[in-house]
Amino acid sequence: MSTVDPALLGAYQTAEYVVLDDPPIVFQIGVEHQGLSLLLLSFGAESACFLTAWNPRSEVLSADENLDRQMRLLALIETERLNYFVGRGESSDGTWAEDSYLIFDLDRKTAMQWARTFEQNAWVWVPGVGPAELVITEY
């Protein structure tokens, strides 16, 4: 099991997760968002995950390093032929933001594997109906 700093967990819990649609969909952990549910429904998706490749284990990397990692994640998404939206996770106090993807119908087990591959502390599970859930990455 992974141990994540409690302050980081708090930041993840209160962050805003933004799906860059028109208009953008902004959701939070533990709060059901009708627009997000409708987006999944419109793609025939049963679930989604919100995942980034930025800043492994919260180690701040350069913009170029983060872009390279994010492109590798995108290559995995496209190889699996999954529908996705570009997104962004943003702290509630505005001190950090990370580019992300909302990935449709990636099963939970594979999402966990991808989170491990990109050394993420946590990621977000989005059920078709119900609130988004913060998932701590298991190492």
Tell me the role of every PLM-derived stretch:
Residues Q28-H33, L74-E78, G87, S91, ...:
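Mature, function-bearing regions of proteins
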Residues W54-P56, L106, Y139:
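Generic structural motif
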Residues L67-T110:
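Amphipathic protein-protein interaction modules
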Residues R57-S62, K109-M112, E133:
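Short, surface-exposed beta-strand/loop "edge" segments at domain boundaries and coil↔beta transitions
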Residues A48-T52, F85-V86, S100-F104, A122-W125, ...:
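Ordered hydrophobic segments in well-structured contexts
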Residues M1-A75:
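N-terminal, charge-rich interaction modules
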Residues W96-P131:
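Short, compact, well-ordered microdomains
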